[in-house]
């Protein structure tokens, strides 16, 4: 599996080396640059040329890092408990998987694009460093590790 650019995306040798190193090492690759320089298109072209699925997570100013992992809906669980719903017996019914969870859980290799990360809170990238480095995270509500 090697990326060398595509007919629609001309990349530099340095960029090809960086992309291929990330693929070989199975590590994240952070691409920085000015708007409109092709960062998003790079991820799409890598996934397309290598036949990999792409999982896109578009960041907004209000996005929190936790949302990429999962979200726990405690309010719905409380409401359902008051209504006597049996669904509350499985806390997993109230966990919504995020894009990072989907990428980690994927049976096939995939490209995870975390796009417009600069729009998020300044601590956003730091909040995901450990999870992306180890390629795993802990779900407190279910006491499980997602890899």
Protein language model annotation of sequence segments:
Residues 18-21, 78-112, 144-145:
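Conserved alpha-helical scaffold flanking the Walker A/P-loop in AAA+ ATPase domains
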Residues 29-75:
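Walker A/P-loop
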Residues 18, 127, 131, 140-142:
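Conserved helical "switch/dimer-interface" subregion of ABC/ABC-like ATPase nucleotide-binding domains
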Residues 26, 50-54, 109, 134-135:
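Short glycine-/polar-rich loops that comprise or flank the Walker A/P-loop
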Residues 10-11, 91-96, 136-140:
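Short gly/ser/thr-rich secondary-structure transition/capping motifs
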Residues 98-133:
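Conserved AAA+/SF3 P-loop NTPase catalytic/coupling segment centered on the Walker-B
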Residues 1-15:
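Dynamic helix-loop-helix/coil hinge segments at AAA+ ATPase domain boundaries and subdomain interfaces
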Residues 117, 134-147:
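Conserved Walker
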């Amino acid at each position: 599996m090697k990326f060398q650019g595509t007919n629609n995306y001309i990349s530099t040798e340095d960029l090809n080396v960086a992309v291929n190193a990330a693929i070989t090492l199975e590590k994240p690759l952070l691409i920085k640059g000015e708007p409109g320089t092709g960062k998003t298109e790079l991820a799409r072209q890598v996934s397309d040329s290598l036949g990999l699925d792409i999982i896109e997570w578009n960041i907004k100013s209000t996005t929190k890092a936790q949302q990429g992992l999962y979200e726990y809906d405690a309010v719905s669980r409380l409401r359902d408990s008051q209504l006597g719903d049996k669904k509350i017996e499985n806390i997993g019914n109230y966990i919504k998987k995020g894009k990072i969870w989907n990428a980690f859980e994927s049976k096939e290799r995939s490209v995870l694009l975390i796009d417009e990360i600069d729009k998020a809170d300044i601590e956003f990238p730091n909040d995901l460093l450990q999870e992306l480095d180890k390629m795993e995270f802990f779900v407190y509500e279910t006491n499980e590790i997602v890899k």
